[in-house]
């Protein structure tokens, strides 16, 4: 058994604090593996390999937060209309192989897209999920692993303006990277709520999880005590 929480729109720093709290609880065996699904307000996050002077081109008047993180990878953009998934998994139960874990996240994304009729794939030498001919990125991955417990995860473009990816940052360090969304590929409106059940099912399939939904309202601060204590109780 594992837990899944649907947090709705949640600030990046609040979600990061929650991940760290949960990771500590998972590491100690207080709670099982736990998966968070959410959306973020507009934010640019910087991975450990970000070169700010080369990658960031954010206008001074842009209403966007910028956060340095401990995840792998370079800079990326999060915003409403993007499904973000943060699996807090103990890799001692999932193979103790970080590269294989990232490949499984890609498999889960490809499965999610396939359920919606979108043909996602990998591109050699690049992390994330893409659509071929011409190559365009539809999902980003960046993870952190400490004591074999994972934080951060993936961001799947459902229906959002891709301009920040190309105008504000040199995403993934690729000058000419193209970006797309599920809505653009299907040529119809698509909501995060429509995509989320397929994402849950794909994670269950790829990681062999049985996800139990824990009731959660929109955001952090729902629990009077630390979340890991609440779930362990």
What annotation goes with each model-predicted range?
Residues 1-138, 189-190, 220-233:
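N-terminal lobe of the biotin/lipoate ligase/transferase fold
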Residues 49-57, 65, 138-158, 162, ...:
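Short, conserved beta-strand/beta-arch hydrophobic-aromatic motifs that form part
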Residues 85-87, 127, 141-143, 154-158, ...:
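A structural signal for short, well-ordered beta-strand segments
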Residues 110, 146, 201:
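Short glycine-/small-residue-rich flexible loop motifs, especially phosphate/cofactor-binding loops
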Residues 130, 159-233:
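C-terminal accessory segment of soluble enzyme catalytic cores
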